[in-house]
Amino acid sequence: MLIYKDIFTDDELSSDSFPMKLVDDLIYEFKGRHVVRKEGDIILAGSNPSAEEGAEDEGSDEHVERGIDIVLNHKLVEMNCYEDASMFKAYIKKFMKNIIDHMEKNNRDKADVDAFKKKIQAWVVSLLAKDRFKNLAFFIGERAAEGAENGQVAIIEYRDVDGTEVPTLMLVKEAILEEKC
């Protein structure tokens, strides 16, 4: 299994247990699902917990959690402050600078850095379009929530796919470390 970790905070932001694609060699997109499950259960995409555990006792006092499977599995924390476009712009400007500094510090080719700048700017402009920005939710990892600075904000866009709302988590590739576990 591959875990996708934030290079700045070491937070686990997603894994290859979710359908994923790389868009424009810039953004990882992971398809999530809305789920309801007993608190603490970690269900991998594609598993069938009802078939494995038998019938659920509807009269129990167990706490049930609802949400997006990626968010629940990786303990991401919602950050409503970024729903304000000016706050998001301030964050993304600093984040882009941190990524570029990281690329340069790791001796990345100037052409790679320039290509990244061009692509990331176009992506950010597309996110800030009013009809798109209102469909975004923002999440951070546990360490970032505890105060670790410079972490990546995981952006979830709610997309309509054949009449079904599909939460799609987006992560900037250059700020992600793939780790086998």
From Swiss-Prot:
What Gene3D superfamilies does the record tag this protein with?
Metal Binding Protein, Guanine Nucleotide Exchange Factor, Chain A (2.170.150.10)
Protein's UniProt keywords contain Cytoplasm: yes
Q: Which InterPro entries match?
A: Mss4-like_sf, Mss4/transl-control_tumour, TCTP, Translation_control_tumour_CS, Translational_control_tumour_p
Q: Which GO terms of the cellular component aspect does the record hold?
A: cytoplasm
Q: Where in or outside the cell is it found?
A: Cytoplasm
Single GO MF annotation: calcium ion binding
UniProt main location, coarse: cytoplasm
What UniProt keywords are attached to this protein's entry?
Calcium, Cytoplasm
Pfam families membership: TCTP
Specify whether Cytoplasm is a keyword of the entry. Answer: yes
Would you say which domain of life the source belongs to? Eukaryota
SUPFAM superfamilies of this UniProt entry?
A: Mss4-like
User: For the TCTP domain, which residue ranges apply?
Assistant: 1-181
- Stated role: Involved in calcium binding and microtubule stabilization.
PANTHER family tied to this protein: TRANSLATIONALLY CONTROLLED TUMOR PROTEIN-RELATED, TRANSLATIONALLY-CONTROLLED TUMOR PROTEIN
User: What does the similarity note say?
Assistant: Belongs to the TCTP family.
Can you name this protein?
Translationally-controlled tumor protein homolog
Name the species this protein comes from. Caenorhabditis briggsae
Phylogenetic placement of the source organism: Eukaryota, Metazoa, Ecdysozoa, Nematoda, Chromadorea
Name of the coding gene: tct-1
